[in-house]
């Protein structure tokens, strides 16, 4: 299918301007296809490294090297984050940003096998597909650069290397630093078990580590001298669980105990819990948070301990932009879904057997989901970007249908050719979307008008993590 055919899907409906002859004949998708080997190579390398948030040194270095080889100008170490960067190519015209996440998750790893197969000595894995995210976004940015260059279209394409999405809120610090203020539109994508460009928002969230200190003592010889920090954690957890009953239906809260002592016969003088609170809007998070802090204070008072807490991260919900989402949906439909080879289908069938009732027909990978508005129950720091500039995203079937994020099945597919195929599809959709935005001023204006109306005339950006500095050691 020629670029002109793909473009016609949206050109009539969305404030189209006549295209220059060269933009009609140069197909941006071909620029993605020309990079297929590089896309898979980078995705696999990042999958092998599986670097954690704010520690993505090799991953970010590789991405910057690839951009530099394509004559992008690189600014590294931005927003006081050593692994964050912006690569830019072009001049004048609109500024279109493409976001690239790269961090892995701790505590889960897996080979690319279709059965459970942890890798000995490896303590992290790409269970959210950010190796694919990075590779696909890098490919799209380079494809857009080549298209701009060949067509002589004015404008700048930027790739934002955004670390620590998984609980580190890297994009929040980048937003707070004003790095998106001159961007016309930001484009992102994510690994998934389906293909969709629906206008899907997310939950606002905040996390913190609650640290209790007490007095150590012999648990049998002198228990009366001890003040158990673990008692403080447990008392707080009990009150938090009671709080669940009085939270709104669409809110949620979860926690883990990260430190609880080392020996049963020693009263622990230190204990720590790690909490997340989520709600569809930031004010809802704040209301629950006040009560959670009260639970922490009450637990300390009742157990004779002390407590302090550190906010680790916080994200605003995604501000959807329907004007952009409808166009992205049309681009995705013009491309179609993910087609498996016989070998890939056999591998996917084995994965599907491990999913139980969550399994879905393998043919779903080749389909495009319906367009509409929906609420996703996860959270992402893309939300803060979406309050700085109009933002649009897409999801593609990089995982076997029915696979959930943060599972070993997601790790396996993210290191498999199925994941690479979904990445290619995402790169093509983003490239088509960016090309449309560069030449369609009417679409850019419509997106900005919707964005301004959604934020409101008196909007002032507020970060849910406050004024803290990036927690560069939160994964150490």
Model region roles, listed by residue range:
Residues 22-126, 131, 135-156:
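Acidic/His- and Gly-rich active-site-bordering loop/insert found
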Residues 132-202:
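Acidic/histidine-rich catalytic neighborhood of metal-dependent amide-processing enzymes
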Residues 1-9:
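Bacterial N-terminal signal peptides that target proteins for export
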Residues 182-340, 344, 350-352:
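Midchain, well-structured core segments that form catalytic/ion-binding scaffolds
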Residues 231-234, 238, 242, 246, ...:
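His/Asp/Glu-rich mid-to-C-terminal helical/loop segments that flank catalytic regions of hydrolases
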Residues 8-18:
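Bacterial N-terminal signal peptides
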Residues 345-427, 445-475:
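Zn-dependent metallopeptidase/amidohydrolase metal-coordination segment
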Residues 46, 87, 98, 130, ...:
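Divalent metal-coordination and catalytic microenvironments
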């Amino acid at each position: 299918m020629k670029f002109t055919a793909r473009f016609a899907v949206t050109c009539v409906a969305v404030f189209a301007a006549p295209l220059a002859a060269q933009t009609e004949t140069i197909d941006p998708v071909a620029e993605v296809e020309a990079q297929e080997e590089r896309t898979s190579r980078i995705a696999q390398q990042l999958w092998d490294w599986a670097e954690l948030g704010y520690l993505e040194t090799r991953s970010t270095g590789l991405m910057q090297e690839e951009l530099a080889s394509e004559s992008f100008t690189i600014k590294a170490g931005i927003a006081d984050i050593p692994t964050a960067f912006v690569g830019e190519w072009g001049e004048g015209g609109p500024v279109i940003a493409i976001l690239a996440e790269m961090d892995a998750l701790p505590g889960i790893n897996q080979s690319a096998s279709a059965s459970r197969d942890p890798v000995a000595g490896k303590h992290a894995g790409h269970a959210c597909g950010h190796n694919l995210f990075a590779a696909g976004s890098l490919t799209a940015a380079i494809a857009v650069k080549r298209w701009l260059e060949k067509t002589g279209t004015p404008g700048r394409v930027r790739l934002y290397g955004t670390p620590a999405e998984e609980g580190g809120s890297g994009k929040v610090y980048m937003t707070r630093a004003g790095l998106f203020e001159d961007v016309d539109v930001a484009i992102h994508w994510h690994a998934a078990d389906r293909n969709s460009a629906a206008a899907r928002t997310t939950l606002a969230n905040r996390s913190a580590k609650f640290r209790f200190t007490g007095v150590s003592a012999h648990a049998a010889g002198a228990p009366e001298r001890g003040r158990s920090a673990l008692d403080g954690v447990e008392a707080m957890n009990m009150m938090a669980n009671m709080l669940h009953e009085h939270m709104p239906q669409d809110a949620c809260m979860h926690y883990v105990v990260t430190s609880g002592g080392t020996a049963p016969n020693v009263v622990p003088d230190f204990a720590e819990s790690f909490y997340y609170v989520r709600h569809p809007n930031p004010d809802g998070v704040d209301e629950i948070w006040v009560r959670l802090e009260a639970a922490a204070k009450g637990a300390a008072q009742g157990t004779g301990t002390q407590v302090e807490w550190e906010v680790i991260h916080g994200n605003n919900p995604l501000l959807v932009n329907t004007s952009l989402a409808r166009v992205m949906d049309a681009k995705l439909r013009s491309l179609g879904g993910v087609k498996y080879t016989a070998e890939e289908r056999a591998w996917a069938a084995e994965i599907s057997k491990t999913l139980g009732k969550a399994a879905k027909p393998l043919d779903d990978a080749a389909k495009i989901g319906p367009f509409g508005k929906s609420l996703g129950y996860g959270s992402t720091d893309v939300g803060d970007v979406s309050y700085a500039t109009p933002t649009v995203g897409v999801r593609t079937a990089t995982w076997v249908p029915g696979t959930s994020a943060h599972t070993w099945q997601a790790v396996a597919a993210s290191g498999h050719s199925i994941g690479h195929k979904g990445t290619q599809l995402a790169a093509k959709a983003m490239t088509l979307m960016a090309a449309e935005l560069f030449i369609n001023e009417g679409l850019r204006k419509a997106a900005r008008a919707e964005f301004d109306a959604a934020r409101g005339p008196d909007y002032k950006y507020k970060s849910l993590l406050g004024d803290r500095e990036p927690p560069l050691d939160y994964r150490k």
